[in-house]
Protein backbone atom coordinates (compact mmCIF):
# COMPACT_ATOMS: atom_id res chain seq x y z
CA UNK A 1 0.00 0.00 0.00
CA UNK A 2 1.49 3.35 -0.97
CA UNK A 3 1.27 6.29 1.36
CA UNK A 4 -0.34 9.61 0.40
CA UNK A 5 1.90 12.58 -0.44
CA UNK A 6 3.25 14.63 2.48
CA UNK A 7 1.06 17.70 1.92
CA UNK A 8 -2.04 15.56 1.62
CA UNK A 9 -1.25 13.77 4.89
CA UNK A 10 -0.93 17.08 6.75
CA UNK A 11 -4.13 18.38 5.16
CA UNK A 12 -6.05 15.27 6.20
CA UNK A 13 -4.69 15.35 9.76
CA UNK A 14 -4.95 19.09 10.38
CA UNK A 15 -8.65 19.20 11.39
CA UNK A 16 -8.33 16.45 14.00
CA UNK A 17 -4.98 17.70 15.31
CA UNK A 18 -6.33 21.27 15.51
CA UNK A 19 -9.34 20.00 17.45
CA UNK A 20 -7.12 18.16 19.96
CA UNK A 21 -4.85 21.18 20.39
CA UNK A 22 -7.83 23.53 20.76
CA UNK A 23 -9.47 21.23 23.32
CA UNK A 24 -6.30 21.58 25.40
CA UNK A 25 -6.67 25.38 25.22
CA UNK A 26 -4.01 26.16 22.62
CA UNK A 27 -3.75 27.31 19.01
CA UNK A 28 -2.34 25.12 16.27
CA UNK A 29 0.18 27.32 14.47
CA UNK A 30 1.62 24.74 12.11
CA UNK A 31 1.36 21.07 11.22
CA UNK A 32 4.05 19.54 9.06
CA UNK A 33 4.47 15.91 8.06
CA UNK A 34 7.74 14.75 6.51
CA UNK A 35 9.15 11.40 5.58
CA UNK A 36 12.14 10.54 7.80
CA UNK A 37 13.51 7.21 6.63
CA UNK A 38 10.85 4.57 7.24
CA UNK A 39 8.93 6.78 9.63
CA UNK A 40 7.08 10.03 9.29
CA UNK A 41 8.02 13.05 11.35
CA UNK A 42 4.91 14.89 12.50
CA UNK A 43 5.80 18.38 13.69
CA UNK A 44 3.13 20.28 15.60
CA UNK A 45 3.72 23.93 16.52
CA UNK A 46 1.38 25.33 19.18
CA UNK A 47 0.97 28.64 20.96
CA UNK A 48 -1.29 30.39 23.47
CA UNK A 49 -1.92 33.91 24.71
CA UNK A 50 0.24 33.29 27.78
CA UNK A 51 2.85 31.24 25.94
CA UNK A 52 3.46 27.51 26.26
CA UNK A 53 5.47 25.76 28.96
CA UNK A 54 7.01 22.30 29.06
CA UNK A 55 4.12 20.84 31.07
CA UNK A 56 1.67 22.10 28.45
CA UNK A 57 3.83 20.70 25.64
CA UNK A 58 3.66 17.28 27.34
CA UNK A 59 -0.11 17.54 27.73
CA UNK A 60 -0.59 18.51 24.09
CA UNK A 61 1.80 15.80 22.96
CA UNK A 62 -0.28 13.13 24.72
CA UNK A 63 -3.53 14.48 23.24
CA UNK A 64 -2.13 14.70 19.70
CA UNK A 65 -0.54 11.26 19.99
CA UNK A 66 -3.96 9.75 20.80
CA UNK A 67 -5.47 11.46 17.76
CA UNK A 68 -2.64 10.31 15.48
CA UNK A 69 -2.93 6.74 16.78
CA UNK A 70 -6.64 6.82 15.96
CA UNK A 71 -5.78 8.03 12.43
CA UNK A 72 -2.75 5.83 11.80
CA UNK A 73 -4.25 4.79 8.46
CA UNK A 74 -3.58 8.33 7.22
CA UNK A 75 0.08 8.17 8.26
CA UNK A 76 0.44 4.70 6.72
CA UNK A 77 3.07 3.55 9.18
CA UNK A 78 4.99 4.56 12.25
CA UNK A 79 5.67 8.17 13.12
CA UNK A 80 7.69 10.39 15.42
CA UNK A 81 5.78 13.24 17.02
CA UNK A 82 7.46 16.56 17.76
CA UNK A 83 5.42 19.19 19.61
CA UNK A 84 6.97 22.61 20.06
CA UNK A 85 6.18 26.29 20.45
CA UNK A 86 7.10 28.89 17.81
CA UNK A 87 10.60 30.30 17.88
CA UNK A 88 11.37 33.96 18.40
CA UNK A 89 11.98 34.35 14.68
CA UNK A 90 8.45 33.32 13.71
CA UNK A 91 6.89 35.91 11.40
CA UNK A 92 3.82 37.70 12.72
CA UNK A 93 1.20 36.63 10.19
CA UNK A 94 -2.07 36.63 12.13
CA UNK A 95 -3.76 39.16 14.42
CA UNK A 96 -3.24 36.87 17.42
CA UNK A 97 0.52 36.91 16.76
CA UNK A 98 0.46 40.70 16.98
CA UNK A 99 -1.60 40.59 20.20
CA UNK A 100 0.97 38.24 21.73
CA UNK A 101 3.77 40.60 20.69
CA UNK A 102 2.30 43.56 22.58
CA UNK A 103 5.05 45.91 23.83
CA UNK A 104 7.69 43.97 21.91
CA UNK A 105 10.00 45.49 19.35
CA UNK A 106 9.20 44.28 15.82
CA UNK A 107 11.00 44.73 12.51
CA UNK A 108 8.41 45.37 9.79
CA UNK A 109 8.76 45.31 6.02
CA UNK A 110 5.86 47.21 4.49
CA UNK A 111 4.27 46.36 1.15
CA UNK A 112 5.84 49.52 -0.33
CA UNK A 113 9.30 48.08 0.46
CA UNK A 114 10.10 50.37 3.38
CA UNK A 115 11.33 48.99 6.70
CA UNK A 116 10.35 50.06 10.20
CA UNK A 117 11.27 49.05 13.70
CA UNK A 118 8.20 49.52 15.86
CA UNK A 119 7.00 48.87 19.39
CA UNK A 120 3.68 47.01 19.26
CA UNK A 121 0.59 48.31 21.02
CA UNK A 122 -3.00 47.16 20.82
CA UNK A 123 -3.95 44.90 17.92
CA UNK A 124 -7.34 43.99 16.49
CA UNK A 125 -8.46 41.99 13.46
CA UNK A 126 -7.66 44.78 10.96
CA UNK A 127 -4.40 46.27 12.20
CA UNK A 128 -2.11 47.22 15.02
CA UNK A 129 -1.22 50.42 16.87
CA UNK A 130 2.54 50.91 16.96
CA UNK A 131 5.10 53.39 18.15
CA UNK A 132 7.38 54.08 15.18
CA UNK A 133 10.09 56.73 15.19
CA UNK A 134 8.52 58.39 18.21
CA UNK A 135 5.04 58.58 16.66
CA UNK A 136 1.92 56.57 17.38
CA UNK A 137 0.45 55.17 14.18
CA UNK A 138 -1.77 52.35 13.00
CA UNK A 139 -0.56 49.72 10.56
CA UNK A 140 -3.13 47.77 8.58
CA UNK A 141 -2.11 44.13 8.25
CA UNK A 142 -2.71 44.33 4.50
CA UNK A 143 0.16 46.86 4.33
CA UNK A 144 2.62 44.56 6.14
CA UNK A 145 4.69 42.27 3.96
CA UNK A 146 6.73 40.72 6.80
CA UNK A 147 7.11 41.30 10.53
CA UNK A 148 9.40 39.56 13.02
CA UNK A 149 9.95 40.19 16.73
CA UNK A 150 13.37 41.61 17.55
CA UNK A 151 15.21 40.11 20.51
CA UNK A 152 15.74 42.70 23.25
CA UNK A 153 18.09 42.31 26.18
CA UNK A 154 16.61 45.07 28.30
CA UNK A 155 13.20 46.27 29.39
CA UNK A 156 11.38 48.57 26.97
CA UNK A 157 11.44 52.25 27.89
CA UNK A 158 8.61 52.99 30.32
CA UNK A 159 7.60 56.10 28.37
CA UNK A 160 7.03 53.99 25.24
CA UNK A 161 4.70 51.70 27.16
CA UNK A 162 2.81 54.65 28.64
CA UNK A 163 2.31 56.17 25.19
CA UNK A 164 1.02 52.87 23.79
CA UNK A 165 -1.34 52.46 26.76
CA UNK A 166 -2.70 55.96 26.26
CA UNK A 167 -3.21 55.23 22.56
CA UNK A 168 -5.12 52.05 23.48
CA UNK A 169 -7.31 54.04 25.87
CA UNK A 170 -7.93 56.70 23.23
CA UNK A 171 -6.29 59.39 25.34
CA UNK A 172 -4.58 62.22 23.46
CA UNK A 173 -0.83 62.42 23.72
CA UNK A 174 0.56 65.08 25.98
CA UNK A 175 3.70 67.08 25.27
CA UNK A 176 5.43 65.71 28.37
CA UNK A 177 5.35 62.22 26.93
CA UNK A 178 7.84 63.17 24.24
CA UNK A 179 10.33 64.77 26.55
CA UNK A 180 9.58 68.40 25.67
CA UNK A 181 8.87 69.49 29.22
CA UNK A 182 10.53 72.45 30.86
CA UNK A 183 12.91 70.17 32.78
CA UNK A 184 14.17 68.38 29.67
CA UNK A 185 14.99 71.49 27.64
From Swiss-Prot:
HAMAP family: RimP. It holds the Pfam family DUF150_C. Keywords: Cytoplasm, Ribosome biogenesis. Required for maturation of 30S ribosomal subunits. The keyword Cytoplasm applies. InterPro entries: Ribosome_maturation_RimP (IPR003728), RimP_C (IPR028998), RimP_N (IPR028989), RimP_N_sf (IPR035956). Residues 162-185 are annotated as: Disordered. This is Ribosome maturation factor RimP. Its main location: cytoplasm. The lineage of its organism: Bacteria, Bacillati, Actinomycetota, Actinomycetes, Pseudonocardiales. The keyword Acyltransferase does not apply. GO terms for biological process: ribosomal small subunit assembly; translation. Belongs to the RimP family. One of its GO terms (cellular component) is cytosol. It is found in: Cytoplasm.
